[in-house]
């Protein structure tokens, strides 16, 4: 609705934006605090294998966080044969219905970054749900002073971040060329 001055106002329940987790791979120290915070938030204990964010080091000194890019076309959703995946309209995050998901892995194959993983002891996919709008991985990364992760507020479905939906080996290869130039061929 509009105010007297014609300014568009939003109700307190409706947010004009969704969030996305920005990433600067060059700032990642490899501390894995993000994996710990994620597993504590979702599993109630330190269990990096059940984290929705993973940190990879495929080349020495090049650590990189790997998490859902929140693709605007979300190819993982139609790939699910049981309809266990959906988009949270408030945050824009992909959500997994644990009760429906069979752990078949179709979402992994459909994801351009192969981001989803299957829970280590249960039969359901793990995909970043943005912690309901308050990403714990970002908090600990910022608190640690690394600033490899940050929250980006965006208009609902205004920008595609699919360029971040890459497999870790692709990202590390790009980083290796950026940092090591001619030596990159030997490293990757």
Show where each model-derived region lies.
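Flanking helices and flexible, charged tails adjoining ferredoxin-like Fe-S electron-transfer domains
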Residues: 9-18, 59-77, 99-188
């Amino acid at each position: 609705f509009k105010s007297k001055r014609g300014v568009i106002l939003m109700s307190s329940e409706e947010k004009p934006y969704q969030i996305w987790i920005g990433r600067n791979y060059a700032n990642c120290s490899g501390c894995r605090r993000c994996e710990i915070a994620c597993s504590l938030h979702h599993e109630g204990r330190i269990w990096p294998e059940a984290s929705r964010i993973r940190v990879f080091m495929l080349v020495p000194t090049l650590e990189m966080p790997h998490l859902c890019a929140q693709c605007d076309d979300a190819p993982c959703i139609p790939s699910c044969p049981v309809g266990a995946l959906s988009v949270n309209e408030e945050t824009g995050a992909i959500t997994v219905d644990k009760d429906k998901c069979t752990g078949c892995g179709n979402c992994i194959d459909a994801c351009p970054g192969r981001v989803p993983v299957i829970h280590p002891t249960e039969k359901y996919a793990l995909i970043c749900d943005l912690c309901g709008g308050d990403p714990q991985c970002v908090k600990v990364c910022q608190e640690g002073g690394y600033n490899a992760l940050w929250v980006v507020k965006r208009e609902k479905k205004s920008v595609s971040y699919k360029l971040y939906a890459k497999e870790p080996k692709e990202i590390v290869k790009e980083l290796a060329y950026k940092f090591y130039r001619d030596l990159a061929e030997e490293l990757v």
